[in-house]
Structures are given as C-alpha cells and as structure tokens.
Swiss-Prot record:
InterPro entries found in the cross-reference section: KH_dom (IPR004087), KH_dom-like_a/b (IPR015946), KH_dom_type_2 (IPR004044), KH_sf_prok-type (IPR009019), Ribosomal_S3_C_sf (IPR036419), Ribosomal_uS3_bac-typ (IPR005704), Ribosomal_uS3_C (IPR001351), Ribosomal_uS3_CS (IPR018280)
Top-rank lineage group of the source organism: Bacteria
Region (Disordered): 244-273
Bias kind Polar residues: ranges: 244-265
Domain KH type-2: 40-110
Subunit structure: Part of the 30S ribosomal subunit. Forms a tight complex with proteins S10 and S14.
GO cellular component: cytosolic small ribosomal subunit
Keyword RNA-binding: yes
Record function comment: Binds the lower part of the 30S subunit head. Binds mRNA in the 70S ribosome, positioning it for translation.
Family classification: Belongs to the universal ribosomal protein uS3 family.
Gene Ontology BP, a term: translation
Species of origin: Mycoplasma pneumoniae (strain ATCC 29342 / M129 / Subtype 1) (Mycoplasmoides pneumoniae)
The protein's name in its UniProt record: Small ribosomal subunit protein uS3
Length: 273
C-alpha cells in the first residue's frame, strides 16, 4: 500500500498536519476554496521559484485567511522595504477577494536539503539545463544524505536524454520505509519542461522516525536544523589497519615468530617423496 499511494496523503492526520485547514458551509464553497488554495500555492511555486518554497499551508475562517509559507530563501519573498510582500498580498487578495482579511507569514527553513520539493525542483532545473541525468541524480543523493537524511529515493521518467521511447530511471540510497506510518517521509513531484517533452521528477526523503504524539505544526527539517559537519582538514590521516587488534588468534610477537619458524622447518609431502 505504501508503495502505491502518495506518501504525504497517507500520513496526513497521523504525523503530518493538513496543508489546508478549514470547514466550508456548502459544497459550492468547498469547491471554490479548493480552487483558490491551488491558485495560491501555484503563485509561490511557479512565480517565486528563486525563493525555494518548500510548503504552503492555509487556514481559513469565513472572514479570514492565514497563509504560512516555508522557504529556503525568504529574502526573495520579502524584498527590499517589504515591496514583494505587498505585491504578493495584492495577488492573493485578487484570488480570494479583497473583502477577506489576509495574514501572510513567511518562515525560513533550517535544512533546505531535507525538503523533497526543493530537491525535486533543483533536479528538474538541472534536467532543463541539459546536465547529464546520472550526474544530476547523483548530486541530489549526495546533498540529501550529507544533510542528515536516513534515505532518499529519486524517480525520473520521460524521454530521458532525448530518447525516442520514454523510460524511467530510479536511484535509492539508505532506508525508505514507505509503509511505516511513523516514518517522517516527505514526497514531492515536479516537472521539467524540455524540447523533447515533459519529464517527471519524483523525490522521497526519509527524515527519521516520529515517536511523539500529536501533529507537528512545522516540518521536521525546520524543527531540527542541519548540523554542522566536523572539520577534518587538520586531522592526521588514519591507515586502514591502525588500532586494530587480532583478538581472534591472540598472538603475541614471540608466538608469531615461533609459529612462522615451525612452518618453515616443517617438511612438505613432496620432499618426502
């Protein structure tokens, strides 16, 4: 089951909070608000790609709308003297209606490389820039694992490298328990527009297990920022066998010498013949 369904949708209400939180009064209002939420998310994901937006959460009442944006580069959303925020606020009010009270909150992500959407978008940009597919996928794997992820799965499908027949290519590194509901797995789908057609990019990132009760208000990569890697430039190089003890044989130096001498003095069967 976990291999087939959307990994985010499978965990909503269990260890992930819903990205749209509201209650409508009628079916018509439900359809209207769903379309508006999709337009608001596309506004950030398409028009503000430089900000590297990871997630957009929306809370509504009948009179207010609260939008929470999680981005790796919030400066592109804020702008100088909050000019971009004013522009974004006007664009959102054109979608939801000017009479609705809007509250826009922008949060910075601590570890962008643990966001599946950011990794998928970077990989799609590399494909559009005609970077070799294997190189781009390998670089994405290395970035995520260095950031502290427990595992990553990348699937790219379409006319890869301009091939006549569409195919898919997949890389998996580390643990990827898609059927374990307590696993904090982030999933995202992005599209790369190439001259040969559309190439789909899917990314799954395993950020560890969640054992606490309740839903997280913010994603795990915001609660647990990226750890600094230790500086190993000034350390002495260590040889492969340094510090290892032969505990299985428990041989001292004299025992090794006597055993080697006995092996040399022992006659062979061929010499007897």
């Amino acid at each position: 089951m976990g291999q087939k369904v959307n990994s985010n949708g499978l965990r909503f209400g269990i260890n992930k909070n819903w990205i749209s939180r509201w209650t409508a009064n009628s079916h018509a209002q439900t359809a209207k608000w769903l379309i508006e939420d999709e337009k608001i998310r596309n506004l950030f994901f398409v028009n503000y790609r430089n900000a590297q937006v990871s997630n957009v959460e929306i809370e509504r009442t009948q009179a207010t709308v609260d939008v929470f944006v999680y981005a790796a580069q919030p400066a592109f959303l804020i702008g100088s003297e909050n000019k971009n925020i004013q522009k974004i606020t006007k664009q959102i009010k054109q979608i939801i209606g000017r009479t609705t009270n809007l509250d826009l909150t922008i949060n910075e992500i601590g570890s962008p490389m643990l966001s599946a959407r950011i990794i998928a978008r970077d990989l799609a940009n590399a494909i559009e820039a005609r970077v070799p597919l294997r190189t781009a996928m390998r670089q994405s794997l290395i970035k995520v694992l260095k950031a502290g992820a427990n595992g990553i799965k990348v699937l790219v499908s379409g006319r890869l490298n301009g091939a006549e027949i569409a195919r898919d290519k997949m890389y998996i590194e580390g643990n990827m328990p898609l059927s374990t509901l307590r696993a904090d797995i982030d999933y995202a789908l992005e599209k790369a527009q190439t001259t040969y057609g559309v190439i789909g990019v899917k990314v799954w990132i395993n950020r560890g297990m969640i054992y606490t009760k309740g839903l997280n208000r913010t994603p795990a990569h915001i609660l647990h920022p990226q750890k600094k890697q230790p500086n190993r430039q000034n350390q002495q190089p260590r040889h492969f066998n340094q510090g290892q003890v032969l505990s299985a044989n428990k041989l001292t130096g004299s025992d090794v010498e006597t055993s080697s001498i006995q092996a040399l003095t022992k006659p062979n069967k061929e010499d007897k013949q």
